From Swiss-Prot:
Belongs to the IF-1 family. GO terms for molecular function: ribosome binding; rRNA binding; translation initiation factor activity. It comes from the Bacteria. HAMAP family: IF_1. Component of the 30S ribosomal translation pre-initiation complex which assembles on the 30S ribosome in the order IF-2 and IF-3, IF-1 and N-formylmethionyl-tRNA(fMet); mRNA recruitment can occur at any time during PIC assembly. This is Translation initiation factor IF-1. Transmembrane segments: none annotated. Its main location: cytoplasm. The keyword Mitochondrion does not apply.
Amino acid sequence: MSKEELLEFPGVVTELLPNATFRVKLENEHEIIAHTAGKMRKNRIRVLAGDKVLVEMTPYDLTKGRITYRFK
């Protein structure tokens, strides 16, 4: 899949789940399950409840996503 097909949405982390997954509430009021991207894990960027994040999603499964950026 090419990067042009990915959907990006801003959201807020509402809950921390096991195995580095998070429940994220998007701006359009949908709740999804998301995990951190590999570069965020590699650089040890912490994500906590209440953080504003940017989530990438595939158009094929709109219930799961990948956190690619944490806003300061």
